[in-house]
Design a protein with these regions (language model features):
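Short intrinsically disordered, low-complexity coil segments enriched in acidic
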Residues: 1-9, 17, 181, 188, ...
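Structural preference for beta-strand elements that scaffold enzyme active sites
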Residues: 20-24, 53-57, 79-81, 120-124, ...
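Canonical radical SAM enzyme core domain
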Residues: 1-10, 30-80, 84-90, 97-113, ...
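Glycine-rich phosphate/diphosphate-binding loops that line cofactor/substrate pockets in enzymes
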Residues: 13-18, 116-118
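Structured loop/turn residues at beta-strand edges in well-structured enzyme cores
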Residues: 18, 75-76, 145
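Short helix-terminating capping/connector loops at secondary-structure junctions
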Residues: 15-21, 49-54, 202
Length: 202
């Protein structure tokens, strides 16, 4: 509700001890909220800023980006994080739409719009058992697309088997734990990081 957004904004700003306050919009898909929601958020931030600098960053899968969104981000100097897992075969191996369709082309269209409007963007890339096997192609893809900042998040997903036969991801502390097929093995993760470091440091 508007009341909850206002209360959160006021209390969050009041709780900060620095002159710069960062709002991070992340979790689920934040672009499912309307632009009007974020306009309201900006208005409330200014109302309660008290002379502090307010910055915003939003993490999105990029598939819902439009010219209107990108104009909003550009005008208000938002940093946009894009969730993209490398070249098309890597990304589409696991990142499918709700309808089970590949999503890479839509994400790349979103990145193109961000560039068109001069929006600062970076990438958050999930490293899984599939794309960890070709780290240089993975890294070079981001360089070629003008990504200045890149964050790697390795998948290590624990599974437990329940008595009814279902296997579910969990934070279980039982002995009968296995990892999902997408999980990166320790040696694989180490190889991935070392290969990219050797390329980057040159």
């Amino acid at each position: 509700s508007d009341e909850m957004l206002e209360q959160f904004t006021r209390e969050y700003i009041e709780a900060q001890t620095m002159n710069q306050v960062l709002f991070t919009w992340h979790g689920g898909e934040p672009l499912l909220r309307s632009i009007d929601f974020y306009r309201k958020a900006l208005s409330l931030q200014q109302k309660y800023a008290g002379g502090r600098r307010i910055d915003n960053v939003i993490q999105t899968n990029g598939t819902l980006l439009t010219d209107e969104w990108c104009e909003f981000f550009a005008q208000n100097h938002w940093l946009v994080g894009i969730s993209i897992d490398g070249p098309q075969p890597d990304h589409d191996h696991y990142r499918l739409t709700a309808a089970g369709k590949p999503s890479w082309k839509k994400v790349m269209q979103g990145i193109k719009l961000l560039k068109k409007h001069g929006v600062e963007w970076n990438a958050m890339a999930v490293v899984n058992a599939y794309n960890a096997n070709h780290p240089l192609e993975f890294y070079r893809f981001f360089k070629e697309n003008g990504c200045q900042f890149l964050q790697f998040t390795p998948i290590v997903e624990r599974l437990t088997r329940h008595e009814d036969g279902r296997t579910l991801a969990s934070l279980a502390d039982k002995d009968e734990i296995s990892l999902s097929e997408a999980s990166v093995a320790p040696e694989q993760w180490g190889y991935f990081l070392c290969a990219i470091f050797d390329e980057w440091v040159r």
